[in-house]
């Protein structure tokens, strides 16, 4: 293994399996492979939690591989070395992360199954000790890799080859990238140069998808500048590593989000289903039949509105008008039936009789004014055969009659028949008086 040059980082398979520093310290090949897989998964998890790009994660993984090519697992804990590699890779790839954040995320990832231990990193003393340890580890890493930051990955050679060969099938591209991601987690990246791994990944991806690679007059692998013997070696090792595995199931550059739990699924807001043709048509439903209480409430409301709208001076009921019309004396012609306006509550307003109205006028008044709001205790309707009479005048005559019959402080009983005769003498005309307060209509001729 050469020293001090870029080619020194590429070793043979035999050197990796038998001549590593860990092997000299008693760490077996199987144990070292297990530790390698562990720190690769740890670097990936920390990088994803820090939201680092895949290139930065690949650089951190490659730095860790190179460190253990010259250092032993028995003397250097992988947790500290892997954290240092993430911190240094973030600076190399120009995606820097604060040291404190890297330490906290790495510590929480390391003790993800022990919440109490994971919270210890927030103690000031523990955090300061971890910072000192990572800074010392960074110095050791830099001296081990000889400050060689010339790190290349198979992604760029694969991208250029796909463009030159005119391969635009997404299935082939995705499988090739997945193969590269898994190859970076093995010792292939310290055995073969990036364009060799890119060529082997493209070949296996095309074979898996039954895709024929174009040649255009020359062999496709010439685009990668590889020799057939070396290409065959990398394809053989990749086939051994991934034998029995589905290349589509290999981890992509960024892991998909975890499957939501049952509670999370219930909280997902789903769009409403598209209505069918029958649902799109509006459904016309009949209005509910109002109950007896609702009918009474509607009638009461309408009556209140009518009473508010029309003046109380035209508030006689239709039934009252009809009964008054039927009670006319026989000697009055039918065409001279009068329509009487309602009396005002105030005593100074007179009630005039409208004579000679037609039947159409009576019907119009009956429709327009439904029920009155008279509040007088005793209501009289006066119909005269020859001319209009003043109700106020008649009331004044009655008062005079009562005054004449008073004896001392107590009024004497009044004879109604005597009162009628007295009014007839005073007025000198035939008068019909209707008393509306009694239960039955009373027609009296004075």
From Swiss-Prot:
- Name the SUPFAM superfamilies on file: Cyclin-like
User: Does the keyword Cell cycle feature in the UniProt annotation?
Assistant: yes
> What are its GO biological-process terms?
cell division; positive regulation of DNA-templated transcription, elongation; positive regulation of transcription by RNA polymerase II
User: Recorded GO terms, molecular function?
Assistant: cyclin-dependent protein serine/threonine kinase activator activity
Q: Name one Pfam family in it.
A: Cyclin_N
Can you cite an annotated GO cellular component? nucleus
Keywords of the record, alphabetical order, are: Cell cycle, Cell division, Cyclin
Keyword S-adenosyl-L-methionine annotated? no
Q: Which SMART domains match?
A: CYCLIN
At the top level, the lineage of the source is Eukaryota
Family to which the UniProt record says this protein belongs: Belongs to the cyclin family. Cyclin T subfamily.
Q: How is this protein named in the record?
A: Cyclin-T1-1
Q: Which organism is it from?
A: Oryza sativa subsp. japonica (Rice)
Name of the gene: CYCT1-1
């Amino acid at each position: 293994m050469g020293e001090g040059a870029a080619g020194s980082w590429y070793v043979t398979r035999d050197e990796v399996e038998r001549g590593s520093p860990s092997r000299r310290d008693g760490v077996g090949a199987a144990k070292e492979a297990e530790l390698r897989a562990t720190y690769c998964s740890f670097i990936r998890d920390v990088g994803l939690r820090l939201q680092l790009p895949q290139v930065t994660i690949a650089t951190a993984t490659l730095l860790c591989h190179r460190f253990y090519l010259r250092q032993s697992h028995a003397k250097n804990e992988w947790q500290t070395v892997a954290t240092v590699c993430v911190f240094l890779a973030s600076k190399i790839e120009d995606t820097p992360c604060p040291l404190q954040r890297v330490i906290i995320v790495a510590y929480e990832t390391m003790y993800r199954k022990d919440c109490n231990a994971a919270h210890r990193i927030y103690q000031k003393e523990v955090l300061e000790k971890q910072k000192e340890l990572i800074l010392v580890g960074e110095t050791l890493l830099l001296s081990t890799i000889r400050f060689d930051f010339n790190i290349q990955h198979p992604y760029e050679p694969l991208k250029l080859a796909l463009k030159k060969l005119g391969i635009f099938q997404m299935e082939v591209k995705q499988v090739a990238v997945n193969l590269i991601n898994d190859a970076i987690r093995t010792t292939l990246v310290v055995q073969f140069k990036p364009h060799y791994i890119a060529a082997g990944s493209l070949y296996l991806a095309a074979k898996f998808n039954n895709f024929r690679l174009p040649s255009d007059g020359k062999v496709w692998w010439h685009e990668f500048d590889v020799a057939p013997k070396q290409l065959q070696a990398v394809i053989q090792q990749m086939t051994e590593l991934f034998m029995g595995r589905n290349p589509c199931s290999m981890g992509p550059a960024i892991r998909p989000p975890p499957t939501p739990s049952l509670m999370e699924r219930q909280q997902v807001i789903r769009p409403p289903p598209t209505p069918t043709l029958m649902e799109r048509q509006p459904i016309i439903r009949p209005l509910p039949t109002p109950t007896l209480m609702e009918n009474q409430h509607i009638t009461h409301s309408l009556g209140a509105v009518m009473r508010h709208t029309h003046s109380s001076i035209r508030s006689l009921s239709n039934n009252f008008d009809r009964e008054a019309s039927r009670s006319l004396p026989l000697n009055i012609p039918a065409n001279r039936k009068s329509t009487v306006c309602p009396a005002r509550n105030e005593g100074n307003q007179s009630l005039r009789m409208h004579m000679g109205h037609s039947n159409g006028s009576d019907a119009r008044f009956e429709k327009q004014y439904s029920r009155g709001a008279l509040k007088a205790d005793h209501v009289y309707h006066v119909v005269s055969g020859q001319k209009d009479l003043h109700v106020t005048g008649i009331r004044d005559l009655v008062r005079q009659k009562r005054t004449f019959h008073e004896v001392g402080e107590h009024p004497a009983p009044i004879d109604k028949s005597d009162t009628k005769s007295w009014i007839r003498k005073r007025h000198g005309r035939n008068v019909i008086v209707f008393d509306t307060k009694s239960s039955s209509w009373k027609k009296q001729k004075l």
